[in-house]
């Protein structure tokens, strides 16, 4: 929020250096970001009047001007500008003058003709057409103000103000106004506050004969006020008003629009003006938008509305998006004759959601969404009407329409002086506290504080204590050391993720971090069918672009995209992992399910299915998880048929591992085979075993037997291992696959699978007969699959 010190002086007079002012306001809770004293870089530049012009004898594009600068004799200035005419008032930089950017002007000769200064453009004065819309970008700045010849240009065009920039927190919307900051200034310096009560004469008639207002949603619109002005004269605003708007960073447009902006800055109450002839049947309806309804806003954009949005409509269609922006159709035009001024109080959360969904944030919405005071509507509307009469911009029709459903009861907050002293660590009497609250217009009655309507942030004792502290002075509160300690606690789930990280790094993998946003086209790249459930994604309302328009439901595209980047940067091999989140929409819920997963990907070097499978098994072992079973699946569209398996522990499917489908690899531009594993971290945590227990080293020797069998090509080795383990029983210490062979003399459609079995008993040395019997049990159990011993 920019504050013009000249504007502030209208409400409270502060006679103190600007640096001290900024320090005092900051220490009282209104943080100052900085300040700018206008015109400090401009020196010895005055208003000049062009008396005569003649062409330069040695140039076809330069002119010799005789300029009256308020001295006894005119000065001669040579210029190359083509827009200067006799009688023009212009900024004249005289000999030894200074301009922004460290430029110094001295007299000299231009192609043999003496020039005693320079006629200045906007740019040379450090200004733009934003400051003076009537001026041109290229050429001399021709003044349209009523200026005195020889007057300092800074005074002539209003560059003699000091502008202070405040950082206003979201809980103080009242300070997004000149009056709000004037209240803070008066309270800080204990000075009287001079608030002006608007006076409107009126030109007769009755507003109710011209306009009808109906509020259908009183929850979202607590108060709606309207007034009518007829016979308006759209023109440029007077200089003083334009200077104040410019100082606060608002571009002057015309008197009607400028009045609404002026009142918004002065009162903090957004205003809007409608052209009455475009309000059908003279009827304004405050209602929710209809499904599929659209409006073309003042910026020329067609916007689609939804039923939760509040609009200001006439008898047929919306005229404005409540609290955000007006409609182009009903805006002020050159032929506008009668207007409606609107001053309303809309629910902050509704305005915020509407502005966010439409992707447009305005000065108006920024104020409404913080929550405004319904009691401020009347003063702001009357001030706008007063300015209309003051500027001669139109005739105010008598009366105003006021649809008021707001609760005007002032909030009462408990007041406890002893509690506040303990809370703040100070020692003030009750009377001193009451006295410190009085400049803030907070009245103490008994054990309660009566809070002004514009201070919606004061809700409890701690809030009142803060007001006492800032009026007492934060710098006066003694510094005390903090007592007590807080210890950070790592949850079991967080520790589990740390162990996963450590295990993956120990196995030589590099961690990656990717965005949770992605493009819908990624689903096409991983070959998901159009009706696949994983395509149901959370859609971002206002994305940065299509590439970040949805939340991912699978971490596979992010992993493959990173593998592709490594491959395209000629990295011969990549071993990557990521602990990421997948976002799954939930029926009837606003927020999605956020699922933590471990994605592991690799290509090149020794990467293959069994290497990645070994990584997964090693990880499960390090995490003290049960051994997982692998079940081949050939239907996943993103993986190679027959080279993809899901992992289960008991009945719980904890993840998958597989080779990426060649088509998917081609879509990502990966020119080699790649493998990806996915593990659900929450399920891993759920199936983990109790803390590991340790046993003494075995006292008896082990016996190793190799077992080679012939089975169907389609039979998973996991089924063989599970059968052997169950048949041999607890004397089987370890089973390890060491060979898979296809080809002669093994029959076609068959494969040879060889295991190494380590047998050991805890209480004795196994005999040869016991070992042979164990192998026989295994073969008998395997026979159910048609498995035979390889000769």
Feature annotation, model-predicted:
Residues 1-205, 340, 359, 363, ...:
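Phosphate-backbone binding interfaces of nucleic-acid-interacting proteins
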Residues 39-43, 200-203, 263, 485-491, ...:
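Beta-rich nucleic-acid/ligand-interaction surfaces
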Residues 180, 413-572, 705, 758-762, ...:
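Extended, well-folded interaction surfaces typified by the phenylalanyl-tRNA synthetase beta subunit core
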Residues 189-215, 392-420, 427:
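Terminal amphipathic helices with adjacent charged low-complexity linkers/tails
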Residues 2, 439-442, 457, 586-599, ...:
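A carboxyl-terminal module marker
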Residues 47-77, 243, 254, 260-329:
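Conserved mixed alpha/beta core segments that line enzyme active sites in large multi-domain catalysts
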Residues 111-131, 135-136, 140-141, 154, ...:
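Mobile "lid/hinge" segments at catalytic clefts and subdomain interfaces of large enzymes
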Residues 4-5, 23, 63, 189, ...:
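Glycine/proline-enriched, intrinsically flexible loops and inter-domain linkers
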